[in-house]
């Protein structure tokens, strides 16, 4: 770099340090939003496929009760446990709330998806200002509208046709 062209009396090292110190100082000066005290409860309903989850989130220690059982007992599959915990992880609220849920209908994947939506909606209800943008960006507040397509008359399944013989 030709420092004489920029400023003849300023050395190259001074130019580099001045730029780096300015950018780091401005990042530190940005005020960080303080999270409010975790004293509010939230309740919401989540749906996915045929499953319906009624969820209540209360300040606590991170205990999960699903249909009267622990989360690991109700969802033995680790993928379902991770899916349900995602809203807390993305908001850095692991262990800050207890979750009580009643789930009916559907299978394990649908129930896990319904529970995740219910938890995300509850966390959104608790603190809309801080949580909504993050949850929305991650797609946790969007209801997955995909359901099983119905069987049609004359077909074996929704789209599978019986074998066709030309002659």
Curated annotation (Swiss-Prot):
GO terms for molecular function: RNA binding; structural constituent of ribosome. Keywords: Ribonucleoprotein, Ribosomal protein. InterPro entries: Ribosomal_Su5_D2-typ_SF, Ribosomal_uS9, Ribosomal_uS9_bac/plastid, Ribosomal_uS9_CS, Ribsml_uS5_D2-typ_fold_subgr. Pfam families: Ribosomal_S9. Residues 17-26 have a biased composition (Polar residues). The keyword Ribonucleoprotein applies. Residues 1-41 are annotated as: Disordered. It comes from the Bacteria. GO terms for biological process: translation. One of its GO terms (cellular component) is small ribosomal subunit. NCBIfam families: PRK00132.1. HAMAP family: Ribosomal_uS9_B (MF_00532_B). Belongs to the universal ribosomal protein uS9 family. This is Small ribosomal subunit protein uS9.
